């Protein structure tokens, strides 16, 4: 979705330059029996990349919901299905108070298909549980006490595991280290570095003090400045991909 590129550009500027706080994102949800669990992943994004929603679906976009929708999922008969999907209407009541209203867009997204099956999805549904240990005002980077993971292959439920926060971080790190060896990662890293460079150029146009400081460093030693910037871009891009990438976790277990 085009809006995701905007979100990435904004987040990259924030992540690398650390001038202002980024925005935590409203999650999708997984309904398991009587529990409604937050999801630290968005299973429908790959579907909407190939089957985009109509341009007029969203009239307003919040910085806390760049994708524009909130989806609710269930595992029914061992299949991952969409229970409902909503957009948020923002309005003021008669007293001038800001209000929000969930409006279903299920029929817009999936027409008359009931219990839309996510047979395109391969990955792990990441559900934080328990107390919030560390709040991070960026994407799904906050750390929780525990995590429930549900492995899905071709839309089918495979297995689940329940981990402490340290066990989850260790698992995520192992997956990321393996992901770094892939051609996909190298491509995404290069794309992220390019977007970071593009974003910083735009950022410099709007902030004269930053532009002056960078120009001063360029004049002092252009070669050293460019080398340092390349290292900075790469580190920022790698950090961004580690914190924001969850779709590289395809299985709960990982082999060495």
Predicted regions: what they are:
Residues 144-229:
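Mixed-charge (acidic/basic) macromolecular-recognition segments
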Residues 81-156, 162-164, 175:
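An exposed acidic His-Trp-rich patch
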Residues 8, 14, 47-56, 127-130:
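Short, basic/low-complexity N-terminal boundary segments at the transition from targeting/disordered tails
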Residues 2, 72, 140-141:
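A general structural signal for short secondary-structure junctions and capping/turn motifs
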Residues 1-26:
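Bacterial Sec-dependent N-terminal signal peptides
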Residues 21-82:
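Start-of-domain marker
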Residues 212-256:
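A cross-kingdom marker for long, charged
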Residues 42-46, 88, 164-167:
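A short, sequence-level motif marking secondary-structure junctions
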């Amino acid at each position: 979705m085009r809006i995701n590129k905007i979100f990435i550009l904004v987040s990259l500027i924030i992540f690398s330059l650390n001038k202002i706080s980024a925005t935590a994102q409203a999650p999708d949800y997984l309904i398991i029996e009587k529990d409604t669990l937050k999801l630290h992943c968005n299973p429908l994004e790959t579907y909407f990349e190939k089957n985009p929603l109509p341009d007029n679906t969203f009239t307003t976009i919040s910085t806390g919901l760049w994708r524009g929708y909130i989806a609710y999922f269930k595992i029914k008969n061992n299949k991952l299905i969409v229970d409902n999907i909503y957009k948020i209407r923002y309005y003021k009541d008669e007293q001038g108070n800001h209000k929000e209203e969930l409006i279903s867009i299920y029929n817009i997204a999936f027409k008359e298909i009931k219990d839309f099956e996510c047979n395109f999805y391969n990955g792990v549904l990441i559900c934080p549980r328990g107390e919030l240990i560390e709040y991070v005002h960026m994407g799904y980077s906050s750390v929780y006490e525990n995590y429930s993971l549900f492995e899905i292959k071709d839309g089918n439920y495979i297995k689940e595991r329940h981990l402490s926060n340290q066990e989850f971080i260790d698992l995520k790190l192992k997956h990321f280290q393996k992901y770094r060896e892939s051609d996909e990662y190298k491509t995404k890293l290069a794309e992220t570095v390019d977007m970071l460079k593009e974003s910083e150029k735009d950022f410099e146009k709007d902030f004269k003090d930053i532009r002056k400081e960078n120009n001063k460093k360029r004049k002092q030693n252009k070669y050293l400045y460019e080398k340092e910037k390349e290292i900075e871009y790469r580190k920022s891009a790698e950090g961004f991909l580690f914190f924001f990438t969850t779709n590289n976790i395809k299985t709960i277990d990982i082999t060495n």
